[in-house]
Amino acid sequence: MADELGTTEREIIAQRLKKAEALRALGVNPFGNGWQPRHLAEELLRHHGDQPAEEIAKAPGDWSLAGRVLAVRSFGKAAFLRVRDRSAELQVWVKKDRVGDQAFEVFKLLDIGDIVGAEGPATRTKTGELTLEARTFTILTKATRPLPEKWHGLTDVEQRYRQRYVDLVVTPGVREAFVKRARIVSGIRRFLDARGYLEVETPTLHKPEEAGGAAARPFETHHNALDLDLKLRIATELHLKRLVVGGLDRVYEIGRIWRNEGIDRRHNPEFTSIEFYQAYATHEDLMRLTEELMHQLAVEVTGGPVVTFQGQAIDLTPPYPRVSMLEVGARALGLAPDDALAGRGLAEALSRAAARENDSEDAWKLEQAAKKTPGEAVALAFEIFGEPQLPKDRPAFVVDFPLETSPLSRRRDADPRLVDRFELFAAGMELANAFSELNDPADQRARFEAQMRAKAAGDEEAMPYDEDFVRALEHGMPPTAGEGIGIDRLAMLFTDSASIRDVILFPLLKSRD
């Protein structure tokens, strides 16, 4: 093995390509196929555990592994390799007098990053490390491009996202984060399947009148054969509720959502959500279900109910406190809740709040809120002043949403100015949004019409009028509750990831000039 330190990347690639040719000259395909490992590194480590060297030496049979070389310590006619497969890292001991002259010539053409196969018995070295002592050794794939930073990891964060295939290899903890993400998704599936929910798939391409279910701008595309303008879905809600009308009383969908909006540490234009709907249930039922789901996921994914996010311990043990959006939002403006919803003194209160706000963007939003409905203004005040004050050490349900904020939610029987809705917050993030569903077709039609007026007034996130959805409600949708959970933010919480890009394998990035 040649030392690559101080050599340019182009020179390293040229050297490695020469080694690939040398392998071919030895009769070894540097990109061959045919080695099938029979074991994983984790199996060897678990099987022998703390056994002493004498006991390991008596164990019958060989181990057959394959993986990527992370490091090499060479001592002339012997070497120790750090090899990682999908389960763990393991030391492999290659000795000329064990593998033979031909295989050792192959070994001498090895580079860090190559993928190798090795077979032989387990042993314990003088330093006490469990090791595979190779009797058979070969290079399976020659890595012609070197890994960065000599295995100290990628230092350019954006490069990590652009070259996730390298990031997964060299950056500690990245692979584990995505394994946890996969366990979150499978855990949600098991949780809902066990409760009689049916997983379904609904369209991702929507006609313009169908592109609703959330307050967001959609991406637009065109179907050439049908000469049809289409939009990528911003939610699965309206199609899933159509299925409830059709008699599928418990349904869910895990899938991709696209929203043409800004990018920050909590938002990516393409993300994954789970939406589920249950007939003959209320938002109160879903609160209890959500508490149970969060607690179960925490135990399954992290080993206990307490997770740590950016240094803050968060206990996911139920029950979770409730915080009133109406009460907190109105009080933040110096108004009584009834006065705020009626608009009494609201414009002046918004102006005062804007004047004392240090953040210029939030100040501008507060000034503009005077043009919106009172309910929307209260919701904005809660977002700016209330959300930062939510509990830090446990999740919280935000309740008491004004009617104007929720065009698809059921009015509260005891107070029609509000809707039966909640949002779940933890670690300063909205993780879930749920409500008792509006199933009155006349009320839904009126709210769609209000959304159309808002769109005509310049609100790009207002929902379109979905006549077919109203028609579905006219056939009768049973009392229903539904919820959406952001998988990516949930993964952020359970993996202690500060940015959503850290839990999306290939996040959207600007093109490099």
From Swiss-Prot:
Mg(2+) 2 binds at E430. It is an enzyme of class 6 (ligase). PROSITE patterns: AA_TRNA_LIGASE_II. The keyword Aminoacyl-tRNA synthetase applies. It is found in: Cytoplasm. It holds the Pfam family tRNA_anti-codon. It comes from the Bacteria. Its cofactor is Mg(2+). Homodimer. This is Lysine--tRNA ligase. It comes from Anaeromyxobacter dehalogenans (strain 2CP-C).
